């Protein structure tokens, strides 16, 4: 009788498609041990969570990652795209966020299905020299992403307290450390405050957009008709993509999902992947609306026929430091202060996510763990150096252009995180039965190779055009060409190597086919004992990631 009840319980917990002959492989980590997991589905149905409660238990990683899509780098590129090209580049934002949703969901699926995040899988898969190169490029991406946060914070301090931008850059070295230190006294309240301040800025731009009333027809054309006609439009489009699709976010998202307890069953993993997809979709939809509002307001105000000469000059060289006038219609004289507070919150919240990304990149590639404040201090000191030099020499205008350069660096860095993600998430040796479907494989590779192709085209044509048009002596141009062209060739060869290299390290293994009951138990997260439907021991689901301060 007990055996019948046990078999009935097993059958109830199996997926509908299970026929007893599945070849599904079981997730294990790179050391060969079964993937740590907890199966909540075996509890009595009356105690199971409802759909919404279960979904809310997975909420957190996607919204934390989405803060990167509202950072000062995004605001800067949005403002300049609107001022220079009106609504022409809205399609870039739409495509970029659709692409971001695709790859962020792949990153989440990779972490859930393998129990390892992207940098750990890279360490296991690639040879030593390749591994160290990928680690170095990932660290450069984190530092490039930190530059807009540094400059954005400096601009906010300049507006609030009228201090020089270069001094504000120095102050950023302490501001984020203070914010990280305050987390121990109530991180959820602190993150809620940051979110409120960021969405205050969003509400301001939505209110301004309602006031200026951008023509709906032109906005829709900009969203759905691809066009690159204005001077510098290609560079601005690359900068927009670089600001939207950040390499370090892929490492971060694949690690954050491991802080959630996911059952090691077909249904459990599939449910987790679906919930993370829904959460990421909601977060990125909000981010798209905010980016749309910023570009629309900037494009409408800066192209108005009754624009004053003073504001026309500001639009000609629009930066975060001078953009508060765009909100005067809604906020009046207090526009600059409220705008500065929102930019400050945006920079600080994005820096926290960058600190976590850098920590998991270092831990995954090098198995080296640092305290968060030390990690932040190292990253921030490196990011401060170029920001300080440029702000001293070029002032706020030069600092604003540095944000665009940092966004372009992120775009060129993207293939070295994106290609491993696409390959691992489409690989049977890594994902087993949870690998991407053929439709997702085709879509993700088309989008990925399209962005990589645009990067290579812009890199080559932009550099050749600069060599032709600059006023340097011919000898200097020849010397620069000798240095840069081999680097471009190495970049292309590295992309080709990562694309066509075959995965060799297996992180999935076949279950014991000689024991059908053991395979059934594995499918349902049951213990190996056949005397009763015991729960799997609550093994650590990644305690090294469980201290991430995510809202529950």
UniProtKB/Swiss-Prot annotation:
Protein name: Metal transporter Nramp6.1
Keywords: Glycoprotein, Ion transport, Membrane, Transmembrane, Transmembrane helix, Transport
Record's function text: Probable divalent metal transporter.
Membrane topology: Multi-pass membrane protein
Recorded GO MF terms: cadmium ion transmembrane transporter activity; manganese ion transmembrane transporter activity
Record's compositionally biased regions (Polar residues): 514-523
GO biological process per UniProt: iron ion transmembrane transport; manganese ion transport
Cellular location(s): Membrane
Claim: Transmembrane helix is one of the keywords in the record: yes
Positions bearing carbohydrate: 11, 306
Keyword rRNA-binding part of the UniProt annotation: no
Family note: Belongs to the NRAMP (TC 2.A.55) family.
Pfam families: Nramp
Gene behind this protein: NRAMP6.1
UniProt GO cellular component terms: plasma membrane
Compositionally skewed regions (Basic and acidic residues) per UniProt: 535-545
Disordered, as annotated region: 511-552
Transmembrane segments: 55-75, 88-108, 133-155, 159-181, 189-209, 238-258, 275-295, 338-358, 377-397, 402-422, 438-458, 478-498
